[in-house]
Amino acid sequence: MSDNVGLSTPRGSGTSGYVQRNLAHFRPRDNYQSYPPKDFDSLKHQPRQPDKGLLEHDRKREVEVKVFELRDKLEEEGVEEDEIETRCDELRRKLLAEMERNQNSRGAPTGPRKNLKMHQVHELADAKIKESERLRQALKISRDYQEGSHWKKQEERLKGALEREANGDSSSMPPPPAPSGPSGGNDRGGDRDRGRGRGFGRRDRDEGRLNSRERRAPPRDWDRPPTPRGRGGRGGRGGRDREVDSYRGAAGRDRSRSRSPIRERSRTRSPVRDTGRSRSPVSERSLSRSRSRSRSYSRSRSPPRRRAADSQDRSLSRSRSRSYSRSPDRDRYREKYRDRDNRD
């Protein structure tokens, strides 16, 4: 062991006696402060302050560079050493005085900032501070102004209002606005009445639409035979089918309205069917059959009747469907077999 470090002898210590510095040990910093500091809000909007010692060193270095240039020039000219020293001292004093003057003057130009490089951090920070100072003087902003202080005042005002409200001090709070309008405090009732009026208006509108549709439906001439149309015809379904569909759509809204005109028509049409049956010619019989076919088809497509309908209407519809359910194909086949039997 050397320099009285460690044990007096390595004997019995289990070590070789070699002493070295602990490389993992870090000395605590002087004037150590935790981050972020307590006054972080005040420091947040301040620009980075340059190191004044480094800036002073750079300025003195520029002065010494100019002094050495003068010395080299005088030595080349062959001037004596004493004369060179005196001239260099005069130039140094002159440049230092000029530097002090520029440093003390606040509105002085910052120098060739455009020649500063990115690694000259302290020089750039100093130039930025001087530029901000000139801008503050031009806009007449006070020195103690802090950026964002206006928002801070608003936050403090809002916080005070919330604290007063929590403490129950409602005397300083403005009174709530009085309800406007003739109804006064009965606004809820007015809104309810308005909602009811809206519902009634919609219902009246639907009923008016139904009535207008019934009015627009053209009256059908039951004495005239319907035009025959096949299944693959151009028109698809006939006008009677469209009318039935429209009544069926209207029945979803108001079933009692949509079914009443159909019943009245079926009752008024009964004498026409009786007269058609009493006629003897074949043409009239086929006409009545085609009529019955279209009517039975429309009846099958009509909307379902109510359960509480009259028994007379039910029996009437059943008898009609039984009497007119014969198709023209069956009649044709029967006539053909009849002719064949007559021939035999």
UniProtKB/Swiss-Prot annotation:
GO terms for cellular component: cytoplasm; nucleus; spliceosomal complex. Pfam families: cwf21. The keyword Nucleus applies. Involved in pre-mRNA splicing. May function at or prior to the first catalytic step of splicing at the catalytic center of the spliceosome. May do so by stabilizing the catalytic center or the position of the RNA substrate. Residues 1-58, 98-344 are annotated as: Disordered. The keyword ATP-binding does not apply. Residues 38-58, 120-167, 188-226, 238-277, 307-316, 327-344 have a biased composition (Basic and acidic residues). Its main location: cytoplasm. Belongs to the CWC21 family. Residues 55-98 form the CWF21 domain. CDD domains: cwf21_CWC21-like. This is Pre-mRNA-splicing factor cwc-21. One of its GO terms (biological process) is RNA splicing. Associates with the NTC complex (or PRP19-associated complex). The NTC complex associates with the spliceosome after the release of the U1 and U4 snRNAs and forms the CWC spliceosome subcomplex reminiscent of a late-stage spliceosome. Residues 1-19 have a biased composition (Polar residues). Residues 288-306 have a biased composition (Basic residues). It is found in: Cytoplasm; Nucleus. Residues 69-105 form a coiled coil. Keywords: Coiled coil, Cytoplasm, mRNA processing, mRNA splicing, Nucleus, Spliceosome. It comes from the Eukaryota. PANTHER family: SERINE/ARGININE REPETITIVE MATRIX 2 (PTHR36562), SERINE_ARGININE REPETITIVE MATRIX 2 (PTHR36562:SF5). The gene is cwc-21.
